[in-house]
């Protein structure tokens, strides 16, 4: 395990900036890669958020979306949202959706973003092992909605 000093040194190599997804404090074309790690589904407007990320990318750069739930059917995504909101309300006694956000992706949403922003998506399918692979079968046997998948999406900005 690295010493505390080593952790501090490593962290000092990266900027720590808080900003809104749709108004990033960076110059046009400043980055080669923009990474949304477990965050894209919190966007209030996926098109606006991705457009802002593309603005910050150099020509030929990539915007990568990781760890955002994907559903083959929009109804499954809506069901997940209902279940999650109900669980939050039971646990905390208040609603969790003060700010509407994307929540999940579908192929249709990704195609719409690609058409609107002239990007091409590359999709990667990570493997999480046997137990993860069995989730859809277990959900079906329990008469539950199909669980989400977590794919990796890479949007290529045109050169």
Descriptions of predicted regions:
Residues 33-46:
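A short SAM/SAH-binding and catalytic strip from SAM-dependent methyltransferases
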Residues 120-159:
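A C-terminal cap/extension of S-adenosyl-L-methionine-dependent methyltransferases
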Residues 72, 86-108:
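Acceptor-substrate binding/catalytic loop of class I
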Residues 99-125:
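Short alpha-helix
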Residues 1-23:
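Class I SAM-dependent methyltransferase SAM/SAH-binding core
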Residues 47-64:
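A short glycine-rich, Lys/Arg-flanked "PGG" loop and its adjoining helix->strand segment in the class I
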Residues 62-88:
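Conserved class I S-adenosyl-L-methionine
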Residues 21-34:
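A short acidic, Gly/Pro-enriched loop at the edge of an enzyme's catalytic core
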